[in-house]
Amino acid sequence: MIKIGVLALQGAVREHIRHIELSGYEGIAIKRVEQLDEIDGLILPGGESTTLRRLMDLYGFKEKLQQLDLPMFGTCAGLIVLAKNVENESGYLNKLDITVERNSFGRQVDSFESELDIKGIANDIEGVFIRAPHIAKVDNGVEILSKVGGKIVAVKQGQYLGVSFHPELTDDYRITKYFIEHMIKH
C-alpha cells in the first residue's frame, strides 16, 4: 500500500493524516529522518515557516529531503519551505521554482476563507487562509493552478504541489487525493 508521510514537527499533522486516510491510503507522522525511506510521498504542513526550518535543521531533515527524489505537497508554511526564493532571501529546500511572499493576505486577524477553482481538481474547493503567503513569481515549468484576487495560491511543478492555504482544516480531501493519485501513483 502507498504510504504518505506528514512531517510531524509542527502544524495540523492529525488533520493531514485524516485526509490521507479518507483518500484510501496510509498516513504516517514523520518524526525521524530514517522514516523518510519508508514513504512514497511527503506532506509539509503549515505552521510558522522560520520555526519549521529551524526544526528541520535541528533534526537533519533539510539535507535528506534535498537529496531525496520524493513527491512533496506543501501547505502554507510548507509551501514557503519548498520555494526557491522567499521575498528577498534564498529558499530552503529549493524544490519549486517560485518566489513566495509571506503573510501577503495580512495578519491572523485578516484570515479568511474562499471558494477556489483549482485547475485539474475542482472548481469548488474551500480554501482556509491563515497568515497566508502567496506566490509572487513562477518560473518556467511551474503550472499555476489557482488564484485569489489576482494572487497565485496554488502551483505544481513535476512531483511538487504547493498551496498557500490549509486544505486540511476542511472536510474536503480532494487536494490530498489529487496529490497522491496524480503526483505519486501516476
Curated annotation (Swiss-Prot):
Q: What's one GO-annotated cellular component? A: glutaminase complex
Listed Gene3D superfamilies: 3.40.50.880
Q: Hydrolase: is it a keyword of this entry?
A: yes
Q: Which GO terms describe its molecular function?
A: glutaminase activity; pyridoxal 5'-phosphate synthase (glutamine hydrolysing) activity
Its GO biological process annotations read: glutamine catabolic process; pyridoxal phosphate biosynthetic process; pyridoxine metabolic process
For binding L-glutamine, which residues are annotated in this chain's numbering?
47-49, 102, 130-131
Q: Does the keyword Transcription apply?
A: no
| Pathway given in the UniProt record | Cofactor biosynthesis; pyridoxal 5'-phosphate biosynthesis
Q: Which residues form the active site?
A: 76, 166, 168
Keywords on this record? Glutamine amidotransferase, Hydrolase, Lyase, Pyridoxal phosphate
One Pfam family, short name: SNO
Query: Catalysed reaction per UniProt?
Result: aldehydo-D-ribose 5-phosphate + D-glyceraldehyde 3-phosphate + L-glutamine = pyridoxal 5'-phosphate + L-glutamate + phosphate + 3 H2O + H(+); L-glutamine + H2O = L-glutamate + NH4(+)
Give the Enzyme Commission number: 4.3.3.6, 3.5.1.2
What the record says about family reads: Belongs to the glutaminase PdxT/SNO family.
Q: Which NCBIfam families match?
A: PLP_synth_Pdx2 (TIGR03800)
Report quaternary structure and partners: In the presence of PdxS, forms a dodecamer of heterodimers. Only shows activity in the heterodimer.
Question: Could you tell me what this protein does?
Answer: Catalyzes the hydrolysis of glutamine to glutamate and ammonia as part of the biosynthesis of pyridoxal 5'-phosphate. The resulting ammonia molecule is channeled to the active site of PdxS.
Know the name of this protein? Pyridoxal 5'-phosphate synthase subunit PdxT
Q: Which organism is it from?
A: Staphylococcus epidermidis (strain ATCC 35984 / DSM 28319 / BCRC 17069 / CCUG 31568 / BM 3577 / RP62A)
